Every structure is written in C-alpha cells, then in structure tokens.
Amino acid sequence: MNILITSAGRRVSLVRAFQKEIKQYFPDGKVYTTDVNPKLSSACQVADGFFKVNKVTEDRYIDYLIRLCVDNNIKIIIPTIDTELIPLVCNRDRFADVGVHCGV
C-alpha cells in the first residue's frame, strides 16, 4: 500500500511522518508526492517518488491522479491545499472504484 501527498511543496515533515508510520504497518509502503514543479519542492525531494502534475484547475487533473494511483498501488490521497478539496470530493466515487480513499 502506498500514499500520495498532493501539492507537497515544502511539507517535508509531513512526508517524513507518513514515511515513518507507513513502514510500521506496510514495510514495503511508499509515500509519493505531486507538485507543479517537483524539482523545486523540498518535500518531493525526500519522498519515495514524485510526479509532476498540472494545476488542479486544469483539465484532466483528476484523470491523471487516478492513473497515478492505479499505476503505483496508491490507496490513500492526502491533499494539502484547499483548491484540491472540491475536485477530490466531487470525484470520490471514481477514486473509490479503483480502491483509493481520498482524505477529504
């Protein structure tokens, strides 16, 4: 089981906290992150892997997140900015259909 933290930015302590906790329950678990510019994101640099994404307001953002989850065995999404909440809630059923829980 893996976790995805979206719009990771500078949330290094959040990524590290999830890395520590997931290993207790899922030794092979990974914490992935997304950001519009992951090479400049300190949280992306400490994550087990990262993905470049478009802004949440752009077309196909949700489709891309779903594909990332399916391709990388991601079961939980942790959003970190307010603008992600409504699109994630509105698409909660789509995520659930592929076995992903949105933390909203």
Q: Positions of the model-derived regions?
A:
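ATP-binding N-terminal substructure of ATP-dependent carboxylate-amine bond-forming enzymes
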Residues: M1-G103
